[in-house]
UniProtKB/Swiss-Prot annotation:
It holds the Pfam family Glucosamine_iso. Belongs to the glucosamine/galactosamine-6-phosphate isomerase family. NagB subfamily. The active site is at D72 (proton acceptor), D141 (for ring-opening step), H143 (proton acceptor), E148 (for ring-opening step). The record marks S151, R158, K160, T161, Y254 as: Part of the allosteric site. It comes from the Bacteria. This is Glucosamine-6-phosphate deaminase. Keywords: Allosteric enzyme, Carbohydrate metabolism, Hydrolase. Pathway: Amino-sugar metabolism; N-acetylneuraminate degradation; D-fructose 6-phosphate from N-acetylneuraminate: step 5/5. GO terms for biological process: carbohydrate metabolic process; glucosamine catabolic process; N-acetylglucosamine catabolic process; N-acetylneuraminate catabolic process.
Amino acid sequence: MRLIPLNRAEQVGAWSAQHIVNRINAFNPTADRPFVLGLPTGGTPLNTYKKLIELHKAGEVSFKNVVTFNMDEYVGLPADHPESYRTFMHENFFNHIDIQPENINLLNGNAEDHEAECQRYEDKIKSYGRINLFMGGVGNDGHIAFNEPASSLSSRTRIKTLTEDTRIANSRFFGGDMNLVPEYSLTIGVGTLLDSEEIMILITGHNKGLALQAAVEGSVNHLWTVSALQLHPKSVIVCDEPSTQELKVKTVKYFQQLEAKNMEGF
């Protein structure tokens, strides 16, 4: 596992965006051989999306031959609801780049048959072989996507009940009213994530400190979903200084020295 310990959240956004651009350009995707990118929602990746849009407008990257799969979606929230993840992705990213609409893949939280919808999503991912790079965030309790604590580390795309902590955290997007936050979601599984060629997780803010500690210094534990990254051959965590407060000083220094050249310019 790699750890990129930067100073500020803005640097996390810049580094992660450049990493995605580098991966896409090195892959040199075509219509018949697209680059497959997994994407999250939430506050943490906003800096990354802003930087990706900036790099796209500067001619540094094209998303014409990029296929995307989003991590999750609320169940029962209308697709055009301002807090649906479909709306989030279009407003904050898709509407500002040259991605082809048919290459955007989002879970349908209003499907009549949730199990069939989840299987459709898994099958669609497999039709491309695998996801080349999956970017994600992490919750205070270490959840990735909506894989809450105690999720199976071999789980696939499925419907999940949201914990009270997650609903309270997400209530900030619903006027502070937890009762307006849906109780269920469709989410990729931990196993789905681990099937990706590469995983990049963004962690910012002091409130994510325990999750980062569990990911880097803890043991693999289904109560900390993020610890599953230790099982992946090509995972990278990009974090800011406030999120490292629970890590040992020598751990941070080790990765600062190890990744010094890769952090130059950020």
